[in-house]
Curated annotation (Swiss-Prot):
UniProt keyword DNA-binding present: no
Membrane topology: Multi-pass membrane protein
Ranges in a coiled coil: none
Keyword annotations: Cell membrane, Membrane, Transmembrane, Transmembrane helix
GO cellular component: plasma membrane
Protein name: UPF0324 membrane protein DVU_2133
Compartment annotation: Cell membrane
Transmembrane regions listed in the UniProt entry: 26-45, 193-215, 225-243, 250-272, 305-327, 369-391, 401-423, 436-456, 476-495, 515-534, 549-571
Annotated family: Belongs to the UPF0324 family.
Length: 579
């Protein structure tokens, strides 16, 4: 019995006041909020007055251009781009933090370049990228000249000629596409030398001590944890290095997948060294990261995209989750209900984040969680490449394509990468819908906790009370929701422009997001190092988990595309026109 209890994602227990400082879920909340509060102090306490001045100037130009022309002019876009360059993390302290949290860099054939890049090597990269940049600049300049001529013609007719206006819009859109390619090429000519060989050991010590505080209060052996953390961190760094290799990056095989692959190879060949095992704290790392993820779910962004996005995320997702679970139970006859629900939520909601919350709510075995996450990572890598290529091949509109990808690709980072492949609109829509979908993490965790208490593990003649649901409910989700509410209030009070600068490009991208990425990588590394192939083998009997995922994702793809088309192009076309 003791062995079974230790093999589930969350152990049962009675609620006590001491849980606040002895339980993992609460420590995930406390540590997450320590980071968020530090971020608010660093980036929100003393904003530069230049930010407000530059924003006001850009908004003035944009308002004047919007009043002058019935479409977004070149001057409008220039002002918009100038505003977009403002970043709260672009300060001495912000740059120092960014350098300290840096992960291994990009490399092609020499892995050492992920850690140390000399000035000569940086200059060589810049020179190699210069020709492509110059070619892109020629095309961008030509597109700009054509756009200027078309806009001038439309202006000459006082913007009263619909044909000239349409032509100007088309030429400006072409310039924006070429300009984006040019900026991407230009970025590759600005590679700077770096050396993170010294900062990585310091970061390892800092993160180890950070998590050790909670380990001490939870009754674990801190010295053994810190020694083991060295091994976990080392494997995580290797995974990040492999995830940034150019070929791996192209095919979407990121650090998360490599963390599990390398960890599993170690665990199932030489075996995970015993000194590392005290630091294999999968849930501790990932729950802390999920609390930080909550700060990225902002209500004002949800409102900005309107009802269409909410329908795509909040109507389709529960339908897909429930139907997939029923399919697994009734048709496939899945032997494990917990594996069924974890895979169903992983596939339908938002990948690993939903999987860990659901696994905690239904007390799934750790091997089941590992299997669900593995399936998610494999299909995420496939979909983030295949979907943009298909959307482009069939000529699907960016808004529709972005909504489709945002509702179906599991990982938030993969959604952004796939959206960026299509263009600005697709990136915005895809990322926003995925963020709206992330809100369901807490809802799904609560729903699964209630269902498992009332229907799956109910005892005859025994009514389910709220206290039992509370015991089952993963408490770290409260931190996720609290972070979302807090930062939504802060974002709303600052206004959309200053929120983008100080919150998105300050607290979040300057501190919490980089740390969240580190925490997730540590968690995936721990999953790999703790996984035994033999323990996973029986779950694949008959290929049922794979069939469940493929069937559910196929249904998800069809229903999401249909809902996105209906909501964005039939019911609310006016919202689509404004995006």
């Amino acid at each position: 019995m003791a062995e079974n209890e230790s093999n589930v994602v969350v152990d049962q227990g009675q609620t006590k006041l001491s849980d606040l400082w002895t339980k993992e879920d609460y420590w995930a909340i406390w540590l997450g909020f320590v980071i968020l509060i530090a971020g608010m102090w660093l980036f929100l306490a003393n904003p530069s007055p230049e930010f407000a001045q530059k924003v006001d100037k850009a908004n003035g130009v944009m308002a004047a251009e919007a009043a002058r022309a019935p479409f977004k002019t070149l001057a409008y876009y220039k002002a918009q781009d100038d505003k977009g360059k403002l970043q709260g993390m672009d300060t001495p302290s912000g740059k120092a933090i960014g350098a300290f949290l840096t992960t291994p860099g990009a490399w092609a054939s020499d892995p050492l370049e992920a850690f140390v890049l000399s000035k000569e090597a940086a200059d060589e990269r810049n020179a190699a990228a210069k020709a492509k940049f110059e070619s892109a600049k020629v095309k961008s300049d030509a597109a700009l000249a054509a756009a200027q001529a078309a806009e001038a013609a439309a202006a000459g007719a006082a913007f009263a000629d619909a044909a000239l206006n349409t032509e100007a819009q088309a030429k400006i859109a072409e310039w924006r596409a070429e300009h984006a390619k040019m900026k991407a090429a230009e970025k590759k000519t600005k590679t700077k030398p770096f050396n993170i060989a010294t900062s990585l050991p310091m970061l390892m010590v800092a993160l180890g001590l950070f998590f050790a505080v909670g380990m001490k209060f939870m009754g674990h052996d801190v010295p053994k944890f810190l020694v083991g953390f060295i091994g976990v961190f080392f494997v995580a760094v290797l995974a990040l290095m492999m995830g940034h290799q150019s070929t791996m990056k192209y095919w979407g095989i990121g650090a998360e997948a490599w963390a599990i692959i390398i960890g599993m190879l170690v665990a199932n060949t030489v075996g995970t060294p015993s000194f590392i095992k005290p630091a294999l704290q999968v849930e501790y790392y990932i729950k802390t990261g999920l609390v930080l993820l909550g700060a990225e779910v902002l209500f004002d962004k949800i409102i900005a995209i309107g009802i269409p996005g909410i329908f795509v995320a909040w109507v389709v997702t529960p339908i897909v989750l429930i139907c997939t679970f029923i399919f697994g139970q009734k048709i496939l006859k899945m032997p494990s209900k917990t594996l069924n629900i974890v895979i169903s939520s992983d596939m339908s909601v938002c990948g690993t984040s939903a999987a860990i919350a659901t696994a905690a709510a239904c007390r799934a075995k750790k091997e089941e969680l590992t299997l669900a996450i593995g399936l998610s990572l494999v299909f995420t890598a496939i979909m983030m490449i295949a979907m943009p290529a298909f959307i482009k091949a069939v000529g699907m509109p960016q808004v529709l394509g972005g909504a489709w990808m945002g509702g179906t690709i599991d990982a938030t980072g993969a959604v952004a990468a796939a959206g960026a492949f299509l263009g600005e609109k697709a990136l915005y829509v895809a990322a926003t819908i995925k963020m709206i979908q992330n809100v369901l993490i807490g809802v799904v965790a609560f729903g699964v906790a209630v269902y498992w208490c009332a229907r799956v593990e109910c005892r005859e003649g025994h009514s389910v009370g709220w206290i039992e649901i509370w015991h089952r409910f993963p408490k770290f989700v409260l931190g996720f929701l609290a972070a979302s509410v807090l930062f939504s209030v802060i974002s709303g009070s600052l206004g959309s422009d200053m929120s983008q600068i100080m919150v998105n490009q300050g607290v979040l991208k300057g501190l919490s997001s980089p740390l969240r990425n580190w925490f997730f990588c540590l968690a995936f590394t721990s999953i790999g190092l703790a996984t035994n192939f033999r323990e996973l083998a029986h779950y694949f009997k008959g290929g049922k988990p794979l069939i469940l995922y493929v069937a559910g994702q196929s249904f998800n793809l069809v229903l999401t595309l249909a809902m996105a088309y209906v909501m964005f192009y039939i019911v609310f076309p006016e919202i689509t026109a404004k995006i």
